Amino acid sequence: PIECLFTVDEETGLTGAFALKEGFMNGDILLNLDSEDEGELFIGCAGGIDSVAEFTYREVDVPTGHFCCKVQVKGLKGGHSGGDIHLGRGNANKLLNRFLSQTSQKYDMYLCEIDGGNLRNAIAREAYAVIAIPDADKHALRTDLNVFAAEVEAEYAVVDPDLQFVLESEAARPKAIDKDTAKRLLQTIYAAPHGVYAMSQDIPGLVETSTNLASVKMKPGHIIRIETSQRSSTASSKQDIANMVRTVFELSLIHISEPTRPY
């Protein structure tokens, strides 16, 4: 006999599947049937792990004579971290961080605010940061961003033709993230892998293993939270890519949450 199980509310956290009681079904083999298109079924799925890290920071004073501005990444297509990860689209968190890292090495930069991405299973489309740099460097910063934007927009001209970098003046911020934490945060985002890690050796064109740097959020209590998700159709590779991300977090000496929702 064939048993059919229909669950609901899977996209928000597999709540239907997790509520399934042991022994409810009798079969030895489970075929997962899934699709976003009516009339089509996918047989099989990737397992996944969410890897989360949290920075605790101190607030420090922004020195007088510093100019505050907001740097934004906009116009990316984003997409599903499973179905679209192979398309090579830009990740707003990675691209913003790339410019912030460059800027922090060149100027006396204070990171006041950072925010990027939203859902754990979506490729980040937008991100922004509020930074403060010496007044004397504000014109040079705009030139730097123009040069940087031209280079990166050329890199993504085919897959993300609407990519934009925007620089806007911002009201003065009295406080910023302490320099040590800001440096470790930028280094962590830079080093954290994102994208396809391995392709299937059995099915041409099928992604086997991937990872998504989903979001960077400031939380109450002086917390900055980085959420990532790893997927693989092979259990050992899933654990391997999750360990890779976890190792990057450990090198930054930050708090790491236990992997959530492994499946």
What are these regions (language model features)?
Residues 61-66, 85-115, 134-210:
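Acidic-enriched catalytic cores of C-N bond-cleaving enzymes acting on peptides and small amides
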Residues 73, 131-135, 228-232:
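Short beta-strand-to-loop capping motifs
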Residues 82, 115-124:
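A structural signal for small-residue-enriched, beta-sheet-centric alpha/beta enzyme cores
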Residues 190-248:
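Long, well-ordered mid-to-C-terminal structural blocks that present hydrophobic/aromatic surfaces
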Residues 51-54, 67-75:
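Short amphipathic
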Residues 254-263:
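Single conserved hydrophobic/aromatic residue that forms the stacking wall/gate
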Residues 1-11, 71-73, 80, 87-103, ...:
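Alpha-helical metal-binding/catalytic segments enriched in His/Glu/Asp
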Residues 1-64, 112, 200, 204:
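Acidic/histidine-rich catalytic neighborhood of metal-dependent amide-processing enzymes
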